[in-house]
Amino acid sequence: MKVKLITVGKLKEKYLKDGIAEYCKRLKRFTKFELEELPDEKIPNNASQAQNTYILEKEGQRILNKISNREFVIVLAIEGKQFSSEKFSQLLSATMLKGYSDLTFVIGGSLGLSQEVKKRASILMSFGLLTLPHQLMRLVFVEQIYRAFMIQEGSPYHK
């Protein structure tokens, strides 16, 4: 199975880059893991709702251009379904058993995601009502993907 994480915006902080790189390295033993950073749009100070919508649509089109019809897509959105680590691991297993060979996760930029991206999702997933910087969410989410594979393996990593 090929697993891809599409994100909006360039990661700036070294400690986040290092953490993500470590989990990407660990994931190689389970899957072909690909991280794709797409450019974000500049948000003007005091942007209007129309400007924000335009930015979301532009970023959304970039995301959709990276997703094929055959991919199972899980989009992180606050209104999505919450999963425990165990249930998330089961979801990944079930996706593989259904014959999907390409699994794509999407994390939006600071404004979130366009409705078109959410409509393309096979599943909307949420980490709860907490607000986290989208760059930090990348590290947390890559760790959870790694944890899901470790749970499938029966590893003591997940206690």
UniProtKB/Swiss-Prot annotation:
Location, primary (coarse class):
cytoplasm
What compartments host this protein?
A: Cytoplasm
Catalytic reaction equation(s): pseudouridine(1915) in 23S rRNA + S-adenosyl-L-methionine = N(3)-methylpseudouridine(1915) in 23S rRNA + S-adenosyl-L-homocysteine + H(+)
User: Cellular component per GO?
Assistant: cytoplasm
Give the keywords, sorted.
Cytoplasm, Methyltransferase, rRNA processing, S-adenosyl-L-methionine, Transferase
Alphabetically, the GO molecular function entries are: rRNA (pseudouridine-N3-)-methyltransferase activity
Q: Give one Pfam hit by family name.
A: SPOUT_MTase
Residues annotated for S-adenosyl-L-methionine binding in this entry: L76, G108, F127, G128, L129, L130, T131, L132
SUPFAM superfamilies for this protein: alpha/beta knot
Keyword Protein transport belongs to the record: no
What Enzyme Commission number does this protein have? 2.1.1.177
UniProt feature coiled coil, ranges:
none
Q: Is Transmembrane included in the keywords of this UniProt record?
A: no
| Subunit relationships | Homodimer.
Q: What NCBIfam families does the entry give?
A: PRK00103.1-3 (NF000985), tRNA_RlmH_YbeA (TIGR00246)
What PANTHER family is this protein classified in?
METHYLTRANSFERASE, RIBOSOMAL RNA LARGE SUBUNIT METHYLTRANSFERASE H
Q: What does this protein do?
A: Specifically methylates the pseudouridine at position 1915 (m3Psi1915) in 23S rRNA.
Family affiliation: Belongs to the RNA methyltransferase RlmH family.
Q: What is the official name of this protein in its record?
A: Ribosomal RNA large subunit methyltransferase H
- Supply the source organism for this entry: Streptococcus mutans serotype c (strain ATCC 700610 / UA159)
What does the organism's lineage look like at the top?
A: Bacteria, Bacillati, Bacillota, Bacilli, Lactobacillales
